[in-house]
């Protein structure tokens, strides 16, 4: 996270 980064 935030959405746009994976797997964060």
From Swiss-Prot:
Main localization category: secreted
Tissue specificity as recorded in UniProt: Expressed by the skin glands.
Subcellular location(s) of the protein: Secreted
GO molecular function, one term: toxin activity
GO biological process: defense response; vasodilation
Keyword Secreted assigned: yes
Cellular-component GO terms for this entry: extracellular region
UniProt keyword annotations, A-Z: Amphibian defense peptide, G-protein coupled receptor impairing toxin, Secreted, Toxin, Vasoactive, Vasodilator
Organism domain of life: Eukaryota
TM region(s), chain numbering: none
Protein family membership: Belongs to the bradykinin-related peptide family.
Function text: Produces in vitro relaxation of rat arterial smooth muscle and constriction of intestinal smooth muscle. May target bradykinin receptors (BDKRB).
Entry protein name: Des-Arg9-[Thr6]-bradykinin
């Amino acid at each position: 996270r935030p959405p746009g980064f994976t797997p964060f």
